[in-house]
Amino acid sequence: MLRVFALALALLCLTSVAQAESPATEPTTTIEEVLQQLRSRSFDDKAAAIDALAHSGHPRADALLKALQDRRLLLDRASDRIVLGERADGGWQLHDPLSEADLGTVESRAAAPITINNRLRRQIENLQAVVGLNNPDAAQRRAAATSLIGTKDPDLLAALRERRAREDNTSVAAAIDTTLNTAALYSEDSDLNTRLNAIEALSGSLEPTVRNALRSRLDSDAPSERKAVETALKRIDARTARYQTADTLFFGLSLGSVLLLAAIGLAITFGVMGVINMAHGELIMLGAYTTFVVQQVFPQGHEWSLLVAIPAAFLISGFVGVLIERFVIRYLYGRPLETLLATFGISLILQQAVRVIFSPLNRSVVTPEWMSGAWQINPVFSLTFNRLYIIAFALTVFLGLLLVLKKTRLGLQVRAVSQNRQTARGLGIRSDRINALTFGLGSGIAGVAGVALAQLTNVGPNLGQAYIIDSFMVVVFGGVGNLWGTLTAAFSLGIANKLLEPVSGAVLAKIFVLVFIILFIQRKPRGLFPQRGRAAEE
């Protein structure tokens, strides 16, 4: 009997031990329970939940931390659960935080963002960086390492060292080394040799935090360290100056492409036909407003609306240009003063018409996603995508117009009329028709320029006035009627403006460029690339 009792007691103890150990083998909390802990009013409880979420290993953990940081993680009062939210029509568009399933739309008061303080924000940033260090994507690991530059947190530095020991990607390893070397400069425990090695390694870095860390060692007691810091800062300054020059040149090319688009249509109407069209800026404005109207007609089509706006702007501005030539300009050939006054009056009419139709207020055009953002080459030099696209677009328009004038029947007739109008008429070319088509072509290209300008500035009735003078300067400087001269002049003036602006300011830079062109025209009245042969004789 005692043996049976002892055996039963032993089995009972084993069962109790097994039951006590079994919960330890299973997760004590699920991801849903962690999210529910964020409802607590205690910031300490939220800190624990954030830490658990970051270390959960769940594929949605990083996105949920980002949503919490951006105040997009909400408490839905109706269901009393944590959801994701996006602003929509004054309310919230709700989504499941894990599956991202649509949960419908609620009023603004029906859901409240989870509140966090600055301490929790820093905790999230640090945890995101630690999670990012173990991301399979090398670019994400590099970004995480870079985001930790300047940190003094021992746990984060330990995580960086652990990652560095097994990192096989060169760029990621370099980013981690930069962060660790910067930490060595801030550390009171690092010896002189360690700091000197760190300074040497950081001497080529362009990170602002690295520069600040180096400056913090300028008051070091060790002369060798001060000298090393000064040498490193000089190297950084030299590299920064080179990239700033490259940045200035890029903005100069960007301005040059805008001037090219604005002036290339004028190069046809003024250069080929000899017509001083003061309404050219308003034709650019019509192209910009066409872009605005297309986006209003297709409110959900911002990503492809430019593909519709470009031909639409060309046709609308070109049609208006043909009307101007047919009803006004054709009666004023050979009378430049009257032409100037008439086109100036047309420009005022177009401006007032736009004010009546669209109101005098500026209108904004939404930039497509594929034109937004920038190509970040390093911390001090980046190329914005919208300007890169506009440079490429300007060159495409230039080459297209060049092919039209050189390889098509219309181009042949335009060149014939521009060289000798009477002979062209004698050969059966209808010069009045060619005049209308040429004016329409130049006006259409002005409209296309307006599409590009709408991506850089607000669309308003006075948009064209900002470019009409610059357009005439480009055409005159490059050589009247010469497209290659227009290209060279546009980029030359654009780069010159941007090189002068840091020294003299934007207004004085334009004045200096204008004075230079006046002096240049005194020396070479026909511009950089004057017409030759019969066209020059005309």
Sequence positions of predicted segments:
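Helix-loop-helix "hairpin" substructures at the membrane interface of multi-pass membrane proteins
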Residues: 383-459, 488
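Transmembrane helix-bundle core of multi-pass membrane transporters
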Residues: 339-407, 434-437, 511, 535-538
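Membrane-embedded helix boundary and interhelical linker motif in transport proteins
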Residues: 279-323, 503
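Inter-helical junctions in multi-pass inner-membrane proteins, predominant
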Residues: 248, 404-405, 409, 438-481, ...
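Extended repeat-based scaffolds of very large eukaryotic assembly and lipid-transport proteins
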Residues: 21-212, 216-246
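Single transmembrane alpha-helix segments in multi-pass membrane proteins
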Residues: 248-293, 323, 327-338, 477-483
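Cytosolic-side transmembrane-helix boundaries in multi-pass membrane proteins
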Residues: 332, 338, 342, 357, ...
